Regions:
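A metal-dependent hydrolase metal-coordination microenvironment
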Residues: 31-199, 204-208, 229-233, 237-243, ...
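Structural recognition of alpha->loop->beta junctions
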Residues: 210-230, 287-296
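Catalytic-domain carbohydrate-binding cleft regions of carbohydrate-active enzymes
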Residues: 223-224, 248, 265
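Short, surface-exposed basic-aromatic patches at helix termini and helix-loop junctions that form
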Residues: 57-61, 210-217, 280
């Protein structure tokens, strides 16, 4: 475990200085567009229950512009046959696969026991079968599935070039750092744009804010994951991932470690039965404002923070300047919207309390309510926050009154998370 941190000096504004906002808007060149994508998805290459091509076609039909299949500790770059009777939903999935893609595409054979086997297509094959330049993009990815003792630690690598095995380590933070380093080293070695992100910190109560706050080379965190086991909202003893994000942001920005952006993903595994017990598609996604639908443009925009995360709320525009952060929400009839502008001000209370382990697992420390406080709450479709000048960062969370179509928990409504605008950084 990392040592608990102290906000020495910086809490009084002594070591903070005005910083640029994380995203800016081009004054020339092609007009940017919003592109919808999911960067955490599973198929028969690991523990998903559908063929890659069928999964991608479904996202395409739902209006997604880009998708990454991120199977556990594997890339789709080798010959692999699956036995239909051994895979979940095998017979039904094979029928749909054959109907959609035809017998010339679906390769089948019988094993020595007469059981039907199907060859899983490699990435180059399945991506080319559904990709449509300028309209639908497929990225090669991996969920690096690691652990420390009993704690599951997962890092996604988006647009990866070569398989990265779990790197291991001597603590939670050490494992995560090694896995992040491996992705970033591959990027340097191959000169291929790619990035890592830390997955579902509350899954298995594996990752605390203290584990995340001093990591290097990680600019993204799943603030929402649609799997029913990941505990986005926390509980009475564990903070929500939203709260973890604010704790991490405050520490990093007051210690010169840089911003972390929030992502939403669905972490889909189950594509047939849609209910709250299944990890279904289309529960969470990112909307990226990029000049074109290419891998480079999507990654550039995300690394600049020019995207938002959503479970259903649509934003037409996000604008920030030296004076304000302004949103334009795409409203629906009969739906109300309230936007919370959230941040931490210089001079915040640095009080911190370590908490006892719960069932042998560390728990995120307790911090002042000054961290990630609600700076303003604005109803309507055009919420704006005028900077007071002492904010370290400001982010926005939009809450609608419209229920999500396939909730994990009763009462879930559609949300959107706007990336933090960094006002003051060490």
């Amino acid at each position: 475990m990392p040592q608990p941190f102290l906000f020495e000096g910086v809490a009084r504004g002594v070591r903070v200085a005005l910083a640029l906002v994380p995203f800016a808007f081009a004054a020339c060149g092609p007009s940017p567009h919003w592109y919808k994508g999911n960067l955490h998805t599973h198929s028969y290459w690991s523990d998903g229950n559908q063929f890659p091509e069928v999964i991608l076609e479904r996202y395409k039909d739902r209006g997604y512009d880009f998708v990454a299949l991120s199977d556990h500790n594997v890339l789709a770059d080798s010959e692999r046959w699956v036995t239909v009777s051994d895979i979940p939903n095998g017979t039904t999935s094979l029928g749909e696969y054959s109907s959609a893609f035809g017998p010339d595409w679906v390769e089948q054979r019988q094993d020595d026991s007469g059981r039907t086997q199907v060859r899983l297509k490699r990435f180059e094959e399945y991506a080319s079968s559904v990709a449509d330049p300028g309209k639908f993009l497929v990225l090669q990815s991996e969920e690096i599935t690691d652990h420390f003792e009993s704690r599951p630690l997962h890092v996604n690598a988006t647009n990866i070039a070569e398989l990265i095995p779990p790197q291991g380590g001597a603590s939670v933070a050490d494992v995560l750092q090694h896995d992040l380093d491996a992705v970033n080293e591959q990027r340097r070695a191959t000169d291929q744009p790619m990035f890592p992100h830390v997955n579902h910190p509350n899954y298995g109560w594996a990752v605390t804010a203290e584990d995340l706050m001093d990591l290097h080379g990680d600019r993204f965190l799943e603030v929402y994951n649609g799997h029913p086991l990941v505990r986005n909202e926390g509980d009475s003893l564990h903070p929500s991932v939203d709260r973890i994000w604010d704790i991490v942001l405050t520490h990093r920005l007051t210690h010169g470690l840089g911003v972390v952006y929030g992502m939403a993903v669905d972490d889909a595994h189950h594509y047939e039965q849609m209910d709250s017990t299944r990890a279904n598609p289309a529960r969470g996604w990112v909307m990226v404002r990029a000049k074109e639908l290419t891998t480079d443009a999507i990654i550039d925009a995300m690394e600049a923070g020019d995207f938002y995360a959503s479970t259903g709320v649509v934003l037409d525009d996000i604008q920030s300047s030296s004076k304000r952060l302004a949103l334009r929400i795409h409203g629906e009839d009969g739906v109300t919207y309230v936007t919370q502008f959230i941040g931490t001000r210089a001079g915040f209370d640095t009080a911190e309390q370590a908490l006892p382990d719960v069932e042998g697992l560390p728990v995120t420390h307790r911090y002042s309510a000054d961290i990630g406080t609600v700076l303003a709450e604005v109803p309507g479709l055009d919420p704006t926050y005028a900077f007071a000048g002492d904010e370290i960062y400001v982010r926005a969370r939009v809450r609608s009154s419209k229920p999500v179509a396939n909730p994990v928990h009763a009462g879930e409504v559609q949300l959107a998370w706007v990336q933090p605008v960094v006002r003051r950084a060490n």
